[in-house]
Amino acid sequence: MTEETDLEDLRRGTDLVKRGFAKMQKGGVIMDVVNREQARIAEDAGAVAVMHLESVPADIRKRGGVARMADPSKLEEIIEEVSIPVMGKARIGHTAEAQILEAAGADMVDESEVLTQADDRYHIDKREFTAPFVCGARNLAEALRRIDEGAAMIRTKGEAGTGDVNQAVTHQRNIQRSIGKLEGMAYEERDEWAREHGAPRRLVHETADRGRLPVVNFAAGGIATPADAALMMQHGCDGIFVGSGIFGAENPQAMGESVVAAVNNYDDPEQLKEIAKNPGKGMKGQANADLDEEEQLQGRGV
C-alpha cells in the first residue's frame, strides 16, 4: 500500500480507524473558518485542522434565524487551498447534511449545536458513515451516548460565540468529576450509574477502566485567548477548538499563533506570560450569565 492509501485508510472506515484519525489531532488547535483565505491564515498560524461553517458562532448569534450547513462548494475550495484536514458542521439529526459533507470530502463532520437543531429526538447514526464525527457534550452521560452512536471525538459544548470560557470549564469539570467517581465504584455500582444517567453500560465500564473517555476529548465553546486555551489543556483536554476567538480578534494571524503556542506550552507559566503579550485585542465577548435560557446553544441535543 502507498503512503497516500494508508492515510486514506486512517481517514475513513471502521470505528477503530475513525478514532485513530481523530486521535491524530491530539495536542493541536482546530480553528473555525468561513472561506479559503481564513483557512490559509489558520494553517499558517499552526492549526492542525480547520472547521468550515457559513458564519462563526458569534455572527450566528447576532444574525439569528436558522443556521444550516454551509455551501459544500466552499468546503471543496478550502480542501484545495490547504494541506491540513478540513471539517464541516451539520445540524443535529440532519443525516442528509452529513452525507453531503462526506461526499464533498470533509475529513470529519461536526454534528453541532451551533447550528439549528434538525431533530429534537435523535442524533445522526454516525456508525453508518465512513467519515469520523465529533460531537459536543456537557457531561459524561452525554459524551458516552454520542460515542455509542459512533462519535470518534468529543468536545465540550461550552457556550459558542460568547468568548466566555466559563461553560467549557464547567462541562470539562463535569466529565472529569464523573470519571473520577466511576473509578472508585464497584462493578455493580457502575451498572447502577449507567441506568440512572441513561449511559451505555459497556462504555461506562470502559471509561472507568481507562480513567478517561475512550475517544479524544477537545475543549470548545467560548475560548477566546491563549490563556483560555492553556486553562482547558490544564483541565485535561486533548486539544482545542477555537471558533469566533480567532477571526473575531483584532489580529487573527497573531491570535492564532498565540493560541497554538499556548497549547504547546500550557504547563509553562513563563512561556505563557510571553505568549499572552503578543496577540493584540481579542474578540468582544458576552458573559454567559447575561444569556437568557432560549439564547443558550448548549442545551441542544442531549
From Swiss-Prot:
GO molecular function: pyridoxal 5'-phosphate synthase (glutamine hydrolysing) activity
Residue positions of the active site: K89
Catalytic reaction(s) noted: aldehydo-D-ribose 5-phosphate + D-glyceraldehyde 3-phosphate + L-glutamine = pyridoxal 5'-phosphate + L-glutamate + phosphate + 3 H2O + H(+)
Binding residue positions for D-glyceraldehyde 3-phosphate: R173
Annotated disulfide bonds: none
Name of the top EC class for this enzyme: lyase
Any one biological process term the GO annotation gives: amino acid metabolic process
The UniProt record lists the keyword Membrane: no
Top-level taxon of the source organism: Archaea
InterPro entries reported in the protein's UniProt record: Aldolase_TIM, PdxS/SNZ, PdxS/SNZ_N, RibuloseP-bd_barrel
A Pfam family assignment: SOR_SNZ
Region of interest: Disordered: 275-302
Protein keywords: Lyase, Pyridoxal phosphate, Schiff base
Pathway membership: Cofactor biosynthesis; pyridoxal 5'-phosphate biosynthesis
EC annotation from Swiss-Prot or TrEMBL: 4.3.3.6
Residues the entry annotates as binding D-ribose 5-phosphate: D32, G161, G222, G243, S244
PANTHER family, alphabetized: PYRIDOXAL 5'-PHOSPHATE SYNTHASE SUBUNIT SNZ1-RELATED
Stored NCBIfam families: PRK04180.1
Role: Catalyzes the formation of pyridoxal 5'-phosphate from ribose 5-phosphate (RBP), glyceraldehyde 3-phosphate (G3P) and ammonia. The ammonia is provided by the PdxT subunit. Can also use ribulose 5-phosphate and dihydroxyacetone phosphate as substrates, resulting from enzyme-catalyzed isomerization of RBP and G3P, respectively.
Record text on subunit structure and interactions: In the presence of PdxT, forms a dodecamer of heterodimers.
Family under the similarity heading: Belongs to the PdxS/SNZ family.
Protein name according to UniProt: Pyridoxal 5'-phosphate synthase subunit PdxS
Protein species of origin: Haloarcula marismortui (strain ATCC 43049 / DSM 3752 / JCM 8966 / VKM B-1809) (Halobacterium marismortui)
